[in-house]
A protein has these predicted regions:
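Conserved alpha/beta core segments of nucleic-acid transaction machinery
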Residues: 98-129, 133
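Positively charged, low-complexity/disordered segments
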Residues: 1-6
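The short coil/loop that forms the "turn" connecting the two helices of the helix-turn-helix
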Residues: 157-158, 176
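Short acidic, hydrophobic short linear motifs in intrinsically disordered regions
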Residues: 138, 143-156
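Short, cationic-aromatic polyanion-contact patches
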Residues: 130-131, 178-200
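Basic amphipathic alpha-helical segments that dock to polyanions
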Residues: 141, 163-173, 188
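Phosphate/pyrophosphate-binding active-site loops
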Residues: 7-111
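Short hinge/loop at the helix->beta-strand junction immediately C-terminal to the helix-turn-helix recognition helix
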Residues: 146, 172-178
Length: 200
């Protein structure tokens, strides 16, 4: 089948470096176009999953999609050149450039997140009404950047009132932002963190 054909460059005894194999698999997937919709998204996700699967990363943290988007015309031209002219070399060089750009973007975002967390932690810790609960909640925000009072209480293993108090402090400091405008069933977002993730 088409999907099995994508797996041809993935055999473990293939001497090609894993990133090169991921690039070749991406071209094959995009060429086969096995689904009616979503092939582009799945093909780009395929790269990230392969890189993690082969142990190059502990988590799926490499997203070349942004680099492809920045160089969209060249991306499509390189894919087309493989199909029409068999120009695998230029595709591979382009792909590896995009992977490097994605890694650079990821490192920059990680540094920015680290700095943001440090600044926000200092603001919380030095606030006159600081609580251990508020600090713990702040530490949980990167893996839970959007939450409710109920979710915060579950994450912290506490009742709703102290969770509400921690959220109120983080909201007062501008760390959390209420997103619904409602008085009930409010949802809070770690807005600055989400902006860092989406701007890249």
């Amino acid at each position: 089948t088409g999907v099995q054909t994508c797996a041809l460059p993935l055999y473990p005894d293939d001497p090609l470096p894993p990133l090169v194999k991921a690039g070749l698999a991406h071209v094959q997937f995009e060429t086969i176009h096995p689904f009616l919709d979503g092939n582009g998204r799945i093909g780009r996700m395929f790269i990230t999953l392969l890189v993690e699967h082969w142990g190059l990363l502990d988590q799926p943290l490499l997203y070349p999609s942004v680099a492809f988007k920045r160089r969209r015309q060249e991306y499509y031209a390189r894919l087309a050149a493989v199909r029409t002219d068999g120009d695998w070399e230029r595709w591979t060089a382009f792909f590896l450039d995009c992977v490097k750009d994605a890694a650079d973007d990821g490192a920059r975002v990680a540094q920015a997140i680290h700095a943001l967390m440090g600044r926000d932690r200092a603001r919380v810790v030095h606030h006159e009404r600081a609580t251990i609960t508020a600090v713990k909640l702040l530490d949980l925000l990167p893996s839970n950047p959007v939450l409710t009072v109920l979710r915060a209480s579950e994450l912290l293993g506490i009742t709703a009132p102290p969770a509400r108090k921690a959220i109120d402090l983080l909201e007062e400091l501008g760390v959390l932002r209420e997103t619904t405008g409602k008085q009930r069933d409010r949802v809070y977002a770690y807005h600055a963190y989400l902006e860092l993730l989406t701007e890249s």
